[in-house]
Design a protein with these regions (language model features):
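Cleavable N-terminal export/targeting peptides
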Residues: 1-28
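Transmembrane beta-barrel domains of Gram-negative outer membranes and organellar outer membranes
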Residues: 21-245
Length: 245
């Protein structure tokens, strides 16, 4: 899995894996894996759009670095629409594979594979898969990922959709870094929606890592995203906390 040919084969395979719009608590995945790391993660996001109910979502997860190149995580996901009560939404199993060592190639590469079992069985189950890329320019870190998503055994027509996520950050200090993030969905991977129907958001973001002693670290990142297309929410606030030990 450490050669460009193998990485390219995995990337091409994602095109043939038989997405929904990015949720307000979605995050930008990075390709690195820490062997032996244990993690408790909290995510939250809320999005508003004129004429629609506010949508909020959150999750709690436990993850573990099983090998130097494989990190696995189990999520319990919750959501709330408008004034309705918060409800359990889904169980998700996420796996991240580091495909190259930092600096081994022009870009660092990884692969994300997620399987989700929605509480509403009419939604079937969901698979999301795609390559992760990172490139550093001195103190500036850039990430770009494109992800394919599809529901199986659902009551709705099954379509493979294409989404993306990106971020740029300046590593000013470990405890405080700043930059920008963006998320988007273009519709079916082989027949994109009209521009007015696509969802694109972007906005400023902050990041940081606070040492707690020993191997214990508290990481955070948060972003305030604004619509960059007609179909996107007007504003989205998202945040992520990770306690690593």
């Amino acid at each position: 899995m450490r050669t460009p040919a193998a990485v390219a084969a995995l990337m091409m395979a994602t095109v043939y894996v038989p997405v929904a719009r990015a949720g307000p608590d979605d995050y930008v995945a990075t390709p690195g894996v820490e062997y032996g790391e244990r993690e408790i993660e909290l995510r939250f996001g809320t999005a508003s759009k004129s004429g629609d109910d506010r949508e909020s979502a959150g999750s709690i997860a436990f993850g573990y670095g099983v090998t130097p190149s494989w990190f696995t995580e189990i999520y319990g996901k919750f959501n709330r629409a408008g004034s309705n009560a918060t409800r359990f939404d889904a169980l998700e199993w996420e796996n991240k594979f580091q495909l190259s060592e930092p600096g081994e190639y022009f870009v660092d590469m990884g692969l994300l594979v997620e399987i989700e079992w929605p509480h509403d069985r009419a939604e079937g189950y969901e698979l999301r898969i795609g390559p992760l890329f990172q490139k550093d320019f001195g103190l500036v870190q850039t990430n770009f990922n494109f992800l394919l998503e599809r529901h199986f055994r659902s009551d709705e027509r099954e379509v493979t959709e294409l989404g993306y996520q990106w971020q740029v950050k300046y590593r000013w200090r470990p405890e405080f870094e700043f930059g920008a993030q963006g998320f988007g969905d273009v519709g079916p991977w082989n027949d994109w929606d009209a521009a007015r129907e696509q969802s694109h958001t972007l906005g400023p973001a902050v990041f940081g890592k606070l040492p707690l002693g020993g191997r214990q670290v508290l990481k955070y990142n948060a972003a305030l995203l604004f619509k960059a297309s007609r179909a996107a929410p007007d504003r989205t606030f998202r945040m992520q906390l990770e306690y690593e030990f």
